[in-house]
From Swiss-Prot:
Keyword Disulfide bond: yes
Recorded name of the encoding gene: IGLV10-54
Natural source organism: Homo sapiens
Main location: secreted
PROSITE patterns: IG_LIKE
Identification of the protein by name: Immunoglobulin lambda variable 10-54
Subcellular location: Secreted; Cell membrane
Ig-like domain segment(s): 22-117
Annotated InterPro entries: Ig-like_dom, Ig-like_dom_sf, Ig-like_fold, Ig_V-set, IgV_Light_Chain
Length: 117
């Protein structure tokens, strides 16, 4: 079986239009099939520390898909291979057992805690 690398591109996204969250992520992560990749997102304590982060996956030509929100809450239908966590001001998304379809852009998004639904 040929060995393949997956490139996971990380993009920082703030869902707050007035106040930028100041989130930072490494530009990319490359791993082999069936390996584990961990993506990180660091921001200020008012955003990542209080609210956690949402993680989204986007394949080229398709809209973003929500993978996780407020730390490790997964929407229905999202595989348990995607697991989010937070330590201090750093949010992480871990993808286990990487599959070809995991090659995508990943967005870390933060919400302003002063916003209400």
């Amino acid at each position: 079986m040929p060995w393949a690398l997956l490139l996971l591109t990380l993009l920082t996204h703030s869902a707050v239009s007035v106040v930028q969250a100041g989130l930072t992520q490494p530009p990319s992560v490359s791993k082999g099939l069936r390996q584990t990749a961990t993506l990180t997102c660091t921001g200020n304590s008012n955003i990542v520390g209080n609210q956690g982060a949402a993680w989204l996956q986007q394949h080229q030509g398709h809209p973003p898909k929500l993978l996780s929100y407020r730390n490790n809450n997964r929407p229905s239908g999202i595989s348990e291979r995607f697991s989010a966590s937070r330590s201090g001001n750093t949010a992480s998304l871990t993808i286990t057992g990487l599959q070809p379809e995991d090659e995508a852009d990943y967005y870390c998004s933060a919400l302003d805690s002063s916003l209400s639904a």
